[in-house]
């Protein structure tokens, strides 16, 4: 560059002006996602130290009761998180590094770190680094180069820091209560165990999820009705018995602190038939016959309506989770089972049937507190 250009464009002054106007931000600093001054005040001055009430989670009650200690960060992050598994597969990671039982935990962690490098903008990228910062005090971005150091440091802390046990984490982060996801036939033994621990820092309460009782089209429906019958201590020979058994188990859940139900539905259900008609459908299925789509929806409408009325009477919130196509990969379902990263979003119409279902409850003033997910 010529001397006259240097005089015309004094780099030192340009850099000073630029630095003043555009200060380099720390990677995911304390104001991450807090874009305005108002947001920063609301979070830091009010929300930050509030107790956590997680009313919809998939934590395992036994692991909570036994105060599980993770041996590696791979165990904590990749032992069962099918959201991470899904994005690893999208990155072309071999299945052995995703769910392999005999794969070295460090190799799995490196595969996750390499995947994360390509996932910037995905919530998993944010969650991963927030967890590294808040639980381990690690502020370095996770990638292939940093994986070994982060792996070793996190594992050291898991081994030495009691605050990183399940109970320790719940205490450290001021978890007031969590609502686990539980089947009506569950005996809630681990919830009882936790409730009996005088020093336990949080409430662990069941949430009522009767998907198997509504899944009349499923191959294991008949076996499940037998299981529900045993749990309720009553014979189930009719649709009225199904409802009675479910309500009986709901009351047991309520006695254990339950405040919410949870239902996974592909779309809304709104085929209203009489009890006699639905009883014929139930009997037909229990005898091993196949049902039409209309019969399946009529059964689900009847049972869900009865449960919604029971929720309303008991002040139980009803969570309805729509629009997922489950278990799309039959080969991997056979190998790994459900909830392993092979669900997808559905494109069926929802609004009309959901409106009709809720309106039917509204006529009699029996709409429970309702939370909708897609």
Q: What does each model-identified segment do?
A:
Residues 23-314, 366-374:
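Metal-cofactor-binding active-site regions of metalloenzymes
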Residues 11-23:
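Short, Lys/Arg-enriched N-terminal segments with co-localized hydrophobic residues
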Residues 290-374:
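Long, well-ordered mid-to-C-terminal structural blocks that present hydrophobic/aromatic surfaces
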Residues 1-10:
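Intrinsically disordered, low-complexity segments enriched in serine/proline and basic residues
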Residues 14, 60-62, 325:
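Alpha-helical and His/Cys-centered functional microenvironments
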